Amino acid sequence: MAIFSVYVVNKAGGLIYQLDSYAPRAEAEKTFSYPLDLLLKLHDERVLVAFGQRDGIRVGHAVLAINGVDVNGKYTADGKEVLEYLGNPANYPVSIRFGRPRLTSNEKLMLASMFHSLFAIGSQLSPEQGSSGIEMLETDTFKLHCFQTLTGIKFVVLADPRQAGIDSLLRKIYEIYSDFALKNPFYSLEMPIRCELFDQNLKLALEVAEKAGTFGPGS
């Protein structure tokens, strides 16, 4: 069981909080000698495989780590430029980990805005008045669950399809938001949530839900 991500979207469709609670699965990790037999290119500030699909490495996969050091965009965590580093024969042999590209901050903002629009469309298309909008979307690999408050704040959780008790978890997150964001004198409504106690209690709630496989009353 797993809870993948949490999003909080304000009533205008702006993303005010986002948390990824899992490490993306690496599709492939391989040690290479020089010259590299893959064609890599820079796209949207990420280093992607453009040609040379093999051994589980696919076109479109991003470079996630080099020699165990995480890659953020086009740089490693220790400040090395990825394409420049891989173009130097002195750095070989080199171990490269590949996987699906991680979403950038801008992409997350855009997706939150798109979901806000889809939510509104769903409410308008309903044959019944007072529709609650989108509450759940299901795919083969995850389910998206949404809870909208009376004030228009949306709490969105992406979870494993087998994860139970998400409705209770969404209300628990709302409770944490009320206790540790709204009651924080330094927090302004509709603005990004940057409250340490909110972070801590949200992560604790996710851990409890994942370990139990559910999140029932009294948790």
Swiss-Prot record:
Endoplasmic reticulum among keywords: yes
Claim: Membrane is one of the keywords in the record: yes
InterPro entries, alphabetized: Longin-like_dom_sf (IPR011012), TRAPPC (IPR007233)
Broad class of where this protein is predominantly found: membrane
Database matches in CDD domains: TRAPPC4_synbindin (cd14856)
One Gene Ontology term, aspect cellular component: TRAPP complex
GO biological process: autophagy; dendrite development; endoplasmic reticulum to Golgi vesicle-mediated transport
Pfam families the UniProt entry points to: Sybindin (PF04099)
Keywords on record: Cell membrane, Endoplasmic reticulum, ER-Golgi transport, Golgi apparatus, Membrane, Postsynaptic cell membrane, Synapse, Transport
Subcellular location: Postsynaptic cell membrane; Golgi apparatus membrane; Endoplasmic reticulum; Vesicle
Record-linked SMART domains: Sybindin
Family the UniProt entry places it in: Belongs to the TRAPP small subunits family. TRAPPC4 subfamily.
Subunit: Component of the multisubunit TRAPP (transport protein particle) complex, which includes at least TRAPPC2, TRAPPC2L, TRAPPC3, TRAPPC3L, TRAPPC4, TRAPPC5, TRAPPC8, TRAPPC9, TRAPPC10, TRAPPC11 and TRAPPC12. Interacts with SDC2.
Function: Core component of the TRAPP complexes which has a function of guanine nucleotide exchange factor activity for Rab1 GTPase. Plays a role in vesicular transport from endoplasmic reticulum to Golgi and autophagy. May play a role in dendrite postsynaptic membrane trafficking.
Name assigned to this protein: Trafficking protein particle complex subunit 4
